């Protein structure tokens, strides 16, 4: 990688609903060190991030450009192509030089980032591209419009779908071919949604039910996780996990046909607390 900072997402599966086996595997088997220290690699430091609060979204005001300038100054020049560096330089951001726009330029940039943020949100929440939906008549969406992790249209003949890329990275972070390639028994498949069966936005003050079929095609597990449309991070509620997961939540009530009814709303239906995920009145939500 040409970057000084690398971020790798690894997934360890639960065993008997617990993470102990995966934790042990990573702590004993994961070794990251400079090649210059291969003969005597330093000990790994593992930090438990559970229960901690992190701000993982970029600013949507003038501070966005200050964040961008920090990256340009910190990273090696080859991280960005000459074309991208030219765009940065056109607004006063260049490696080795101070970023100090005058009041006129600050005003222009502040307006620009507000419009850009609104455009990205509209692309995500009010799309007009039918390729984003799983099938005709469905309000469930796929992570990659056209199901291409490189956002290429018609296998590249139509170039790169820039709106699709903007949409994806506005609400997601990691990208891998295995989230798009359909291999039986391998990889992972994702669907997400923010509309109910009538096409209305999901409302945290209302109640909803989703049925997971007993023969859902999931070899390891299925999961339904609730997110906040403002932060695009997990919805903050009184529950430690705003989600239901078939490996972890073994106490869920299962129907006679093997299916599972999941409930969403501000309060749990009586007797179905194990199948309920809390939402926040006055706030929207979406599910992956």
Q: Predicted segments — roles?
A:
Residues 1-288:
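A compositional/structural signature for long, glycine/proline-rich flexible linkers
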């Amino acid at each position: 990688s040409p970057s000084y900072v690398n971020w790798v997402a690894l997934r360890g599966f639960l065993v008997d609903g617990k993470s102990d086996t995966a934790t042990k595997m990573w702590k004993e088997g994961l070794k990251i060190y400079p090649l210059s220290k291969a003969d005597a690699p330093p000990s790994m430091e593992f930090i438990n991030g559970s229960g901690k609060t992190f701000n993982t979204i970029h600013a949507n005001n003038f501070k966005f450009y200050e964040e961008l300038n920090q990256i340009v100054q910190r990273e090696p020049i080859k991280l960005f192509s000459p074309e991208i560096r030219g765009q940065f330089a056109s607004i006063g951001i260049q490696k080795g030089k101070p970023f100090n726009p005058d009041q006129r330029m600050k005003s222009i940039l502040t307006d620009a980032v507000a419009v850009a943020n609104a455009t990205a949100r509209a692309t995500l929440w009010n799309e007009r591209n039918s390729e984003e939906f799983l099938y005709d008549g469905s309000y469930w969406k796929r992570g990659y419009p056209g199901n291409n992790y490189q956002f290429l249209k018609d296998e590249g003949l139509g170039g790169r779908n820039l709106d699709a890329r903007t949409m994806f990275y506005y609400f997601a972070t990691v990208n891998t071919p295995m989230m798009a390639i359909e291999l039986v028994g391998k990889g992972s498949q994702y669907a997400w949604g923010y509309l109910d069966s009538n096409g209305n936005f999901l409302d945290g003050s209302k109640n909803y039910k989703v049925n997971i079929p007993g023969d859902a095609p999931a070899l390891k597990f299925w999961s339904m996780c609730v997110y906040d449309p403002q932060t695009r991070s997990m919805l903050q509620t009184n529950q430690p996990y705003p989600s239901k997961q078939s490996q972890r939540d073994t106490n869920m009530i299962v129907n006679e046909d093997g299916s599972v009814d999941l409930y969403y709303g501000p309060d749990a239906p009586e007797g179905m607390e194990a199948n309920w995920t809390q939402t926040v009145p006055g706030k929207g939500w979406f599910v992956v």
